[in-house]
Design a protein with these regions (language model features):
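Glycine/aspartate-rich loop-and-adjacent alpha/beta segment that forms the canonical ThDP
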Residues: 400-427
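Short, basic phosphate-binding NTP loop
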Residues: 1-8, 12-108, 129, 275, ...
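Residue-level signal for inorganic ion chemistry
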Residues: 21, 69, 109, 138, ...
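C-terminal helical cap/extension that packs against the catalytic core
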Residues: 43-49, 332-395
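Phosphate-binding loop of NTP-binding sites
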Residues: 61-66, 73-233, 380, 417-427
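Residues in the short beta-alpha loop(s) of Rossmann-like NAD(P)-binding domains
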Residues: 9, 34-36, 139, 220, ...
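Nucleotide phosphate-binding/pyrophosphate-handling subdomain across enzymes
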Residues: 20, 24, 246-342
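Short internal beta-strands
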Residues: 26-34, 189, 214-218, 320-324, ...
Length: 427
């Protein structure tokens, strides 16, 4: 099959799509309007695997050549080149066509805010209660990554899909309304100051209405009921479904609590499962707390400026920073503030580290150790810098500011490597 990846994506979402089809022996081309340099080094890896890369514009011949076009959600459905495509999908519509979908209870999470927290908390709680659960969508996990797991026999009981409102609408239009009937649809919040509640509900897209359970804010419940008609069996407000939530839990847990309650779990089960939720994986995730140190996984920091936002959270504490990785097209100067303030720096190996970070550190006479090929070596070095006699809380922080693909494939694998390395320290 000839597969065209239409739009590589600002966070290289096309990488997972391309790899999925390359691993199956398909012919793959990638087309993007950006220059080759701005796309990063992931495309070099894909090219070595057999993909053909066309940058700085699109060619009609690529669309005529293709049997299947995988469209980036950022590309409008009325794009002129799509008229030449035989078949068009995005990652979610392609996944929905798989027969395994009928074996999985899907929970869709959308809204203007709290999507990532709600999705991650639901995934954690369901797994904690013994129900195998995966998640994909907006948090950076492509549905093609999920399909790879299915191909290997790892089919979950539940799948959490985090969707932006425009992705939900895009997927609905792609499928011409024939979307799968999901177990639950969660609308976490609505846009501020909509003209009417009907408008707010409409913005969330009809994809959300084909569900056994719809859980939404009380302010749009009536509008959602009107829109859903007979498509949903049970529409509940977050507020009404979460009244028994433990007062020890933060208010942001009301959304996942309400969903789990409507799915039939007891209050005691839900409260216990959510109590152990430490935060969104790979985003300032607390991995370990000792008497005088915190180990934080911020592996989703894939651009230099993101490191500053994370380090600023701990500005009053000594931060032992683990950073670096792939993609030499990035400008390391954006994280110079954090490099200067760090109590110590342990570098992870990669093209960004070698070509950008190390020269910047040397230019500014900032000490560092590494680069380390293995995460456990970087974690071990950072931990050795902790002052065991200090009464001040210290932080060992993985915040790479770079792509993980050369050594880890994606930021989630990199985060797992960090967590495993930390767990080895306390054995």
């Amino acid at each position: 099959m000839n597969v065209l990846i239409f739009g590589y994506g600002l966070r290289a979402g096309g990488f997972d799509s391309a790899m999925y089809f390359l691993q199956r022996g398909d012919n793959v081309r990638i087309t993007d309007i950006r220059s080759r340099d701005s796309m990063g080094e992931g495309v070099d890896y894909l090219e070595k695997k057999g993909a053909v890369i066309h940058c700085s514009g699109h060619l009609t011949d690529d669309f005529l050549w293709s049997d299947l076009v995988i469209k980036s959600p950022s590309i409008r459905q009325d794009n002129e080149f799509l008229a030449f495509a035989k078949r068009i999908e995005n990652d979610l519509t392609y996944a929905s066509s798989r027969p395994e979908v009928s074996q999985v209870k899907i929970i869709c999470v959308t809204g203007s805010r709290y999507k990532a927290t709600t999705s991650s908390a639901l995934c954690h709680a369901l797994n904690e209660m013994g129900h195998r659960t995966h998640m994909c969508g907006n948090m950076g996990i492509s549905a093609f990554s999920e399909l790879q797991k299915w191909d290997e026999g790892d089919i979950p009981e539940y799948l959490i899909i985090e969707m932006s409102t425009w992705l939900a609408r895009d997927t609905y239009l792609f499928m011409k309304g024939n979307v799968p009937h999901v177990e639950a649809s969660v609308i976490t919040s609505v846009f501020e100051n909509p003209d009417t509640t009907e408008e707010a509900a409409n913005r969330l897209g009809e994809f959300n209405l084909h569900a056994n359970h719809i859980i939404c804010p009380a302010e749009v419940k009536d509008a959602i009921e009107k829109l859903a008609a007979k498509k949903a069996k049970n529409i509940s407000s977050i507020e009404a479904a979460s009244w028994a939530m433990s007062k020890a839990l933060p208010d942001k847990m009301r959304r996942p609590y309400a969903v789990l309650k409507k799915l039939g779990f007891s209050s005691s089960q839900i409260n216990a499962a959510l109590k152990s939720f430490k935060g969104i994986p790979n985003r300032c995730e607390l991995v370990l707390r000792t008497e005088n140190a915190m180990y934080i996984n911020d592996s989703s920091s894939v651009i230099p400026v993101a490191v500053n936002f994370t380090v600023d959270n701990y500005e009053s504490l000594p931060v032992h920073l683990i950073c670096g990785g792939s993609d030499s097209s990035l400008d390391a100067h954006a994280m110079l503030q954090s490099l200067r303030s760090a109590a110590s720096i342990s570098l992870l190996a990669g093209s960004f580290t070698q070509k950008k970070l190390i020269p910047l550190l040397r230019e500014n006479k900032i000490a560092f150790k590494g680069p380390y090929e293995k995460m456990e070596e970087a974690v071990r070095n950072a931990s050795s810098k902790l002052n065991s006699k200090s009464s001040i809380l210290q932080v060992v922080l993985l915040s790479p500011g770079a792509s993980p693909f050369e050594n880890y494939g994606n930021e989630f694998s990199r985060g797992e490597a960090f967590k495993q390395a930390v767990s080895q320290l306390v054995r």
